Amino acid sequence: MSESVLETERYAHEELERLQQAIVDRQVANPKAPRERLRLEHQSAQFLNQFRETSKKLLVSHESSDRLKDQEVARINADDDLTEFYKSLGEIQEFHKKYPDHKVEDLSQLYSIKPSQPGIDEIDTLFRGEEMYGRFMDLNECYEEYINLSNVQHISYLEYLKNLEDFDQIPKPEKNQTYINYITHLYEYLVSFYRRTHPLSNLDKIIAVFDTEFDAAWEAGLPGWYSHNAEAEKDGKDSTEAFYCEVCQKFFGKITVFEAHKKSKAHNKAVKRMQSSSPSTTSNTNEKQKGPKAIARIEFLIKKLTSLLDDVRKDTRENVVRRQTLTAAERLAEVEAAEREAFEQSTPSVSVEGNQDEESDQDDEEKIYNPLKLPLGWDGKPIPFWLWKLHGLGKEFPCEICGNYVYMGRKAFDKHFTEQRHIYGLKCLGISPSPLFNQITSIDEALQLWQKYKVDSKKRETTMASLNEMEDDEGNVMSEKVYNDLKAQGLL
């Protein structure tokens, strides 16, 4: 069945309304899981692009003067419009009788929010494992390129993240083709990371604004760079462009070295190769990608992009510091737990109509996956493995006095000596609770210590009694015990 021009336009209008509603539904859903949030944002970005393309086609259809379209409008506006209506209805019925299995496309179901299916989703292919769905940046490849640059101090990955946009420490003569490849790779990664984590942002427009700012800064005299050689030489400053060879794509620190280079055989061979090459290789496009201004532009854009991603870079540095304290097994367990949590939270909590999904609530009440038997936190979920390791909750401290009860972690073990369970165990042994019995968990040791404590107490009482002296009426001085014995015998 061939569709008419008006039906095609009507279908396009319906598609625009469905796309608009689909985007609104995804913005209202606002899931907590980063993976699910990014998945819906990328879907919204795709729908926006589809909305633009459909709008352009519909606008062209409205503005064009099609003979078939004019004939359809004339038939609809005719006096016998019911005849045309029944004629169209008959064609539709005849088509479906001929093709009874023909599926009708339901736009409401096509653009509805669907839960993540088991397996690898499209959003999983956009991020590396180190990036954790946009929470952190993975700059290990750029770091390897940086430390392999000539005359660059070898620094740690953590320091590299801190001084990512500090390009002034690299001398200008060392900014060769290898350096250009490095900053180009870094710039492309930052652009790609921003597009993947902010799919609804217009990055092209943002970069256009940055380019305008760079042109203004370049004309005004960008720090470390000069856009006009004549002005730089006139002011007595070193002109960066004056010491740059566009043929060999090299910087030179002094004008004497630069002049000597232009007379060298290597430079002359490079000039001959450029002259003998095809015109396409020396086009304006390639010229814009070379020279100090192109290098300064990439550095300027990297600084701007790192400022936009400053929070992510801070989180990345904190994550690197934290991961340095973990073992390989702990890192693997943490990654598995994070991936499991991302998949568990990927089910949307809002349905197409905007109501709460009762099935997701039932899933949350099911048994929590806890293979490591980690303690539960305040939210009812297992605490992170690194926190469990930090507090030593994997160490067992049994106490025989408490009925062989096992305490997990030093903190809980030290605290239990003042709790009711331990005090009750001491009283059952006939021992009066005292701080002296802290860190004593064996019954035999506690009884031995208690016997020794009683003997020492009696000795202290005897010693105290012998230290007290008494004096009779005649002035004789004696101990309190002797005095009491003589007095009892009536000798005093």
UniProtKB/Swiss-Prot annotation:
Gene encoding this polypeptide? Answer: sap61
Q: Quote the SUPFAM superfamilies the UniProt record gives.
A: beta-beta-alpha zinc fingers
Q: What is this protein called?
A: Pre-mRNA-splicing factor sap61
What SMART domains would the database entry show?
A: ZnF_C2H2 (SM00355), ZnF_U1 (SM00451)
Residue list for modification Phosphoserine: S360
Please state the residue ranges covered by C2H2-type zinc fingers: 243-267
| Protein species of origin | Schizosaccharomyces pombe (strain 972 / ATCC 24843)
The organism's place on the tree of life at top rank: Eukaryota
Known role: Involved in mRNA splicing where it associates with cdc5 and the other cwf proteins as part of the spliceosome.
Q: Where is the composition biased (Polar residues)?
A: 345-354
The alphabetized list of GO BP terms reads: mRNA cis splicing, via spliceosome; mRNA splicing, via spliceosome
Q: Where is this region: Disordered?
A: 268-291, 337-365
Q: Does the keyword Ion transport apply?
A: no
Instruction: Quote the biased-composition stretches of kind Low complexity, using this chain's numbering.
Output: 276-286
